[in-house]
Every structure is written in C-alpha cells, then in structure tokens.
C-alpha cells in the first residue's frame, strides 16, 4: 500500500504546519505531480484556511514530501490538543503541455449561437481584478471538437457582446485534475490573458465547461497566435489515510 507518516508538526499562534510523507511500499504510483486532490482534512473546531503543497518527490525512496499550512480565519491562536489528519485520495501521473492553438483562428464565429446556463450548473468564475464576468450564464453553443490534450476539448470560439469567447470542455474533473487556460500572443510576443472566465457543469454533472472571455477586437485577433497551457491525465488512487498528532503552542 501507500503509507502516510507525519514527520513533524508545529503550532505557533494562529498557524499550524504539518510536514508529512506518503511512501509507496508496493510500486511506482507516486511522482512529482502528486497531490491530495483536495481530500485532505485537519479539523480544529474553529474556522480555518489552509493549503497543502508538494515539497519534493524522492524517486529512490518512492516518497512524496508535503507541507500543510493552516491558519485561523480570525487571527486568534489555534487550540492545542491531539488532532487527526486524514486524506482519501491521491492524484498522480499528471502531465503538463503548452500547445499552439492558432488553428482556432480559422473557426472564429462572428455570430455564434448562445445558450443560457442555469444558475445551479455554474461552478464558479474568476477575473484578474475580481470583477464578475458580464453576461455570466450565457455561453457559446459547442460547435467544435479540437482536443489539445487527453480529456480536454476546445468546443467553440466566437465574438459575442464585444468580447471574444473561447470555450473548453474538461471531460471528467471529478476523477482528474484536468485544467488549463488559453492566452493570446501578440506579434511582439506580448501575452494577453482572459479578462474573465466562468465554469459550468455538463448535463451529467461530471464534466465541466470553461468559458474564457477576452477583451480584443476581430482585427487585433487576426494578428495574434493562440496558446494553451494544460494539465491533464492523472491516476486517482483512493484510500483511507489517517494519523493523529499532538499539537502544542511553541
């Protein structure tokens, strides 16, 4: 199996840190891309924020080293005591790719068909300045099937309400961590990221669409290249890892 071990733990004021390892005792299932797929949990009985990052992977020892950092939301000291850290999933064997998608320029639709997305299907949204996407919930209707990476498909591109929309489909995000983003590359090499993005479930609730909105004119777009950055694939390992650790204020 795969063994979890807490190497050290520290509690100082409003912050707790755990240094832990995951070691594959049977094979080579772990690698430098592995993570807990948001399944990790350490409960304090108070509201906390946290993150878990992979520090390194030792292929000779078949061991991944992680650092988990937690902080109280109100800045108050976290309580002392014995606490249980648990995780149910590991995602490994992911691959990263950077792909020229300029062929999409041949498919830009100036009058695309639009679909309305029900609020309950919208997963979330984002923008560099934190502003909500305009016309969120109105997305392009899929018309393309261009797959730049396994499990990822570009499904539509077109201008609507003054913005360029590019739509991508991630086939099964409930069992993989497939994700990515597109950018426009100007002739001078300047990279232009999406001004807004929003995400919505497919009809089955297992795959997800990503709609990226760019503030650019058709004439400006004609001079650009399109590039995609993707993380795809991966093997999901399920288990029930649990360890109890004492934490005292240092």
Where does each model-flagged region fall?
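Alpha-helical, hydrophobic structural elements that either
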Residues: 1-250
């Amino acid at each position: 199996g795969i063994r979890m071990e807490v190497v050290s733990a520290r509690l100082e004021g409003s912050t707790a840190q755990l240094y832990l390892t995951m070691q594959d005792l049977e094979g080579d299932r772990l690698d430098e891309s592995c993570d807990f797929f948001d399944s990790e949990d350490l409960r304090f009985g108070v509201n906390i924020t946290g993150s878990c990052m992979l520090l390194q992977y030792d292929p000779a020892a078949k061991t991944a080293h992680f650092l988990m950092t937690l902080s109280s939301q109100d800045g108050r000291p976290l309580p002392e005591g014995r606490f249980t850290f648990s995780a149910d999933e590991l995602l490994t064997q992911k691959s990263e790719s950077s792909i020229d998608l300029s062929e999409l320029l041949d498919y830009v639709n100036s009058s695309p068909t639009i679909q309305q997305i029900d609020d309950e299907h919208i997963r979330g949204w984002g923008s560099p300045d934190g502003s909500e996407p305009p016309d969120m919930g109105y997305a392009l209707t899929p018309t393309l099937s261009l797959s730049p990476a396994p499990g990822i498909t570009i499904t539509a591109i077109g201008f609507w309400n003054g913005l360029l929309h590019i739509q991508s489909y991630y086939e099964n995000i409930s069992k993989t961590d497939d994700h990515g983003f597109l950018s426009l590359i100007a002739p001078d090499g300047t990279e232009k990221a999406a001004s807004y993005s929003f995400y919505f479930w497919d009809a089955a609730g297992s795959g997800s669409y990503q709609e990226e909105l760019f503030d650019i004119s058709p004439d400006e777009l004609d001079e650009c290249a399109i590039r995609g950055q993707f993380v795809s694939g991966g093997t999901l390992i399920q288990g029930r890892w649990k360890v109890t650790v004492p934490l005292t204020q240092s």
